[in-house]
């Protein structure tokens, strides 16, 4: 494949299904990494020499109920080391701003609450950003990546922190893929994040691959930008919505308006 973009399960932070094959359905971090280690060499194998792979991730946290203390877990760093072990070169990292007030309302995390500053602000911490970490496979890139990126756009893309990503800029029908019995959390990646990465690190006509295809965010954005899409998805409800969205995007792109 020419480029891979995906958002992996965030260890045991979110559980997406009760399927024992689901990487998010684990009892510990050690169990997650034991299974994830099988995937990384295969990602290295299918990626073309000199090309890139990007992951959309966030840091993990501990909890009082489960761990007995509050702290940040360096999930980002653990993944970087894991991919380097398999031969990948750590190429780039992008931080994405997230609204700490929205996170406080959604998670009810005491560390983000303003009221906690009135009691004991040693407990408080800033909100957590998202990250896109990008790796390069060693070797010469035979087909150079050349897109029409003007100077102003490049200055925006080159910023170390993307401040303007709208957290609601996600594929519109993702909630329809929700399964009643086993759904725990749904976290589609913002389309603008995927678009920026495709623009930087893939050409028109390239094959873009996601091993965690979800409801099709990466794949549909690939089609929209005249790339080709390969997605893998374990969960049936996600897979069915993924197929539906791919077909809908393909139909929309190839439709012709006829005037009579």
Predicted regions and their residues:
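Core catalytic lobe of class I
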Residues: 1-241, 259
């Amino acid at each position: 494949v020419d480029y891979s973009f995906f958002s992996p399960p965030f260890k045991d932070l979110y559980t997406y299904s009760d399927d024992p094959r689901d990487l998010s359905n684990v009892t510990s971090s050690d169990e997650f990494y034991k299974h994830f280690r099988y995937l990384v060499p295969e990602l290295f194998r299918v990626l073309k020499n000199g090309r890139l792979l990007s992951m959309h991730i966030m840091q993990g946290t501990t909890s009082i109920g489960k761990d007995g203390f509050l702290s940040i877990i360096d999930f980002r760093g653990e993944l970087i080391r894991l991919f380097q072990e398999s031969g990948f070169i750590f190429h780039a990292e992008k931080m994405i701003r997230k609204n700490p007030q929205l996170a406080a309302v959604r998670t009810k995390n005491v560390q983000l609450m303003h009221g906690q500053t009135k009691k004991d602000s040693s407990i408080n911490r800033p909100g957590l950003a998202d990250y896109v970490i990008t790796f390069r496979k060693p070797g010469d890139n035979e087909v150079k990546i050349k897109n029409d990126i003007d100077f102003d756009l490049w200055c925006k893309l080159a910023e170390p922190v993307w401040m303007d990503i709208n957290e609601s800029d996600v594929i519109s029908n993702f909630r329809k893929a929700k399964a009643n019995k086993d759904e725990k959390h749904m976290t589609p990646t913002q389309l603008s994040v995927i678009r920026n990465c495709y623009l930087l690190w893939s050409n028109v006509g390239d094959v873009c691959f996601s091993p965690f295809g979800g409801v099709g965010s990466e794949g549909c954005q690939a089609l929209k930008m005249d790339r080709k899409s390969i997605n893998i998805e374990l969960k049936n409800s996600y897979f069915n919505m993924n197929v539906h969205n791919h077909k809908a995007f393909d139909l929309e792109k190839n439709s012709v308006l006829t005037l009579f």
